Amino acid sequence: MSEDIRRGPGRPPKKRVVPNFERKGILEKPVRPQSRLEFSYDNPLIFKNLFIYFKNLKSKNILVRCTPTEITFFSRDQSQASFVIATIDGKNVNHYYASDVFWLGINRELVEKMFNSIDRSFLKITIVHRYDKPETLFFIFTDFDIDKECTYHITVSEPELDMDLIEMEKSISEERLKNYPLRWEFTSKQLKKTFSDLSNYTELVTIEKLGGDTPLHLYFQKFNSISYHEMYKSSNKINLTSTIPKSQVFQINVKIAHIKSLASAMVTDKIRILCEENGNLIFQSEMDALMLNTITLNNMI
C-alpha cells in the first residue's frame, strides 16, 4: 500500500512554527513602568500542572512571595500534614522583575478555573502586578498562531502570613539538603503503587537502610497476621544515595495515608525522596524552571 493511501484524503497536517523565545532572566527595570512585578514565561502549562497539584491536595489559600530574584508559592494540603513550596528562579524565565519583597494571597479555586482553560495553543504567560492596582494580579496568555491575548484580572489580597508554613522553607535550604542522610528517586507510578498496596494492610511502614552499599528496605509486620518486605537491591536504578556510616542503621516509621495522598496528587513523572533522622520526608520534583518541594512532618503522625 502506498504512503499516499495510508495517509488518506485531505491535506497533510500543517507544521506548527514555534517562536524562539529568549530567556533574558532578571531585569533591572520593568518593561511596563507601572509594574511592581513582571513575569514572562514561555511554558504556561507548568502553572496549570502546579495548580492541578494544589487541587489534588485540596489546598485552599496560596501565599505568593515575590522577591527581586524569584517567585515562590506556599500552601498546605487538606490534612495540614504536608507543606508545599514551589519556586521559580527569575533567571530561568523569559524576563522577570520584582521591585522588592512583597506577599500576595490568592484563592486556589479561582485561579484553578483560569488555568483549566489554558491549552497548548498558548505559548506564553505574563503575570503583572501594578502599583496603581494593588488589589489585582493580571494574567496574560498569548496564542501566537492567531496573535491573540487573553487577559484575566484576579483579585488578590495582602495576606495574613502563615509563619509555620513559611518556616518550612528552612527544611529545603541548600545547606540543610546536604545533610539529609538518605535519598532516592521513584517514578510517580512506583510511588503510587507502593503506598497504595501498603495501605491495604497497615497504617505505618518502616523505611530502613544499613550504612554502606546496601539495599533500601520498606516493610511492615503485623504479629500473628501478615508481614511484607520490599527491597531495592540496585542503588543505581533508583539513584539511591546515603551518608549513613557503615556501622549504623537508618530507620524511620511513616504514616502511609500521608504519602498515599501525595502520591495520588503528583503531576511529575520523577520524584526525589529525602529522609531526615526525625522522620520528616521531602518530595522534590522539577518542571522546567519550577522546583516543587513537599515537606511531610513525622511529628504530625
Swiss-Prot record:
Induction trigger: Expressed in the late phase of the viral replicative cycle.
A biological process term (GO) from this entry: symbiont-mediated suppression of host cytoplasmic pattern recognition receptor signaling pathway via inhibition of IRF3 activity
The entry's keywords: Host-virus interaction, Inhibition of host innate immune response by virus, Inhibition of host IRF3 by virus, Inhibition of host RLR pathway by virus, Late protein, Viral immunoevasion
Gene3D superfamilies associated with the record: 3.70.10.10
InterPro entries xref list: DNA_clamp_sf
Function field: Plays a role in the inhibition of host innate immune system by acting as a negatively regulator of type I interferon production. Mechanistically, interacts with and prevents host IRF3 nuclear localization to inhibit its transcriptional activity.
Family stated for the protein in its record: Belongs to the asfivirus E301R family.
Subunit structure comment from the entry: Interacts with host IRF3.
Protein name: Uncharacterized protein E301R
Lineage of producing organism: Viruses, Varidnaviria, Bamfordvirae, Nucleocytoviricota, Pokkesviricetes
